[in-house]
């Protein structure tokens, strides 16, 4: 079903790189600000513009803030001195969020369980949650067009407070985002990212369903419902 597995080897110049990083960060800001008032709710919304009074400023967003902490770790240590334990130390020193998987990972680390144990122990409820893949862009931006290199750091990142599909989700998005610096074909990007995660994991299964629905000509709501229905069957 899935085709090409490697990105283009096209060279990216400094100007193009800067433009894509700016687009990545700005787009993330826009999406996070648009969705912030609806976070935690499960119904489908039809949002065409901001619903809050922003006074010209984006909403606070941990999806972005966490990535700035990772960038700080890279700047202070050098990229190849950063690993899961270093990221765990920066988490304890700089990140205050106590909720869900963030809180579990932080409590585990405070009690001496270093990553990757911090993301797996006593975390059955949240280990597959979305707190890791939402902070994956930084690794793609640091390794543009080099998904395999980016994945090493995405794993170190995700295992601080996730396990299993919570990690696979970040690997998927990181690979896709890194390859997107040199490849524009969306289907090729999806194929590249799928090749980096287990074919039988929930992330790959859900992406496959979304592709199937798209190829059948169904709209995004139908595709979304098909994914949700499949996940509900898994949990029965």
Kindly give the residue locations of the regions a language model identified:
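Amphipathic alpha-helical interface segments
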Residues: 89-200, 207-214
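Small-residue-rich helix-loop
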Residues: 203-231
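Active-site-adjacent bridging/hinge elements
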Residues: 2-6, 37-50, 103-117, 142-153, ...
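Aromatic-rich carbohydrate-recognition surfaces in CAZymes
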Residues: 58-87, 91, 95
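Conserved aromatic-histidine-acidic binding/catalytic patches
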Residues: 13-18, 55-62, 75, 79, ...
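Conserved small/polar residues in nucleotide/adenosyl-binding loops
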Residues: 234-236
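An N-terminal structural lobe/cap that precedes and organizes the functional/catalytic core
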Residues: 6-67
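Short, charged, surface-exposed loops that flank catalytic or proteolytic processing sites
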Residues: 78-84, 182-189, 219
């Amino acid at each position: 079903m899935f085709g090409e597995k490697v990105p283009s080897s096209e060279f990216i110049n400094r100007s193009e790189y800067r433009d894509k990083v700016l687009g990545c960060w700005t787009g993330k800001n826009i999406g996070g600000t648009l969705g912030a008032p609806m976070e935690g709710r499960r119904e489908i919304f039809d949002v065409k513009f901001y619903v809050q009074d922003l006074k010209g400023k984006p909403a606070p967003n941990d999806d972005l803030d966490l990535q700035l902490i990772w960038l700080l770790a890279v700047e202070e240590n050098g990229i190849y001195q950063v690993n899961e334990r270093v990221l765990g130390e920066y988490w304890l020193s700089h990140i205050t969020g106590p909720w869900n998987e963030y809180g579990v990972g932080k409590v585990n680390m405070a009690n001496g369980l270093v990553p990757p144990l911090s993301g797996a122990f006593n975390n059955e409820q949240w280990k597959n949650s979305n707190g890791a893949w939402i902070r994956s862009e930084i690794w793609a931006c640091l390794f543009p067009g080099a998904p395999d290199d980016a994945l090493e750091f995405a794993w170190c990142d995700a295992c601080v407070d996730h396990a299993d599909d919570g990690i696979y989700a970040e690997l998927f998005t990181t690979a896709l985002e890194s390859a997107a610096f040199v490849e524009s074909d969306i289907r090729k990007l999806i194929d590249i990212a799928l090749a980096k995660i287990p074919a039988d994991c929930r992330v790959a299964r859900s992406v496959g369903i979304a592709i199937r629905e798209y190829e059948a000509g169904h709209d995004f709501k139908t595709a979304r419902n098909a994914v949700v229905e499949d996940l509900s069957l898994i949990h029965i």
